[in-house]
Amino acid sequence: MKVRSPCQAGAFYAGTKSSLTKQIDSCFLHKLGPGKLPAPNKKGKRSIVALVCPHAGYMYSGPVAANSYFALAKDGIPETCVIMGPNHTGMGSGVSIMIEGAWETPLGTSSIDAETAKKIQEQSKIIDVDESAHRLEHSIEVQLPFLQYTYGTNLKFVPICMMMQDLTTSCEVGEAISNAISGSNAIIIASSDMTHYENQAAASKKDMSVIEQILGLDEESL
């Protein structure tokens, strides 16, 4: 089995199991985080469809991301997770998916949901099987330790790295994911930094505008 080694351990997040566990602890307990540690709700009915989580270093956005994972833990236990992230490196295809193997972090090794990944790839002509786009990309990798911390390493996932993010491409990818996971207990995580170097007022204004468009399913305005 192919195992992707972490490229950001010791950079975007702590590089050892003990130090990373403590770092994620502090993200959840931080004043900008939920203020307590997550406890997965085994009886949760799973109503959350998707999360939007930042992908900066944990020292910058970890507590904000922790709010999303705390809500997800309270909501229940998903069976699989589709993680979508932007391509910062310029490597690989315009939309790249991995359909086999596993990813390693200091917290352990999580397997790719091969069945779901293949279904997604088969539903779209624009999604390519391409490992090179993922090799040095951080946007998806930084989500994985939060999932492993919350649910352990048994939760499988599907990584999709997007260099092309125009409306047509995004709609096609979204439809492929929707068709592939329809009727399943899956969560979608959109890895996105909504703000860089702006004050709270400006960031909140932009955030609320985007949230309104997401809730209204208005992809063109978004």
Predicted regions and their residues:
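Active-site histidine-anchored catalytic micro-motif
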Residues: 1-222
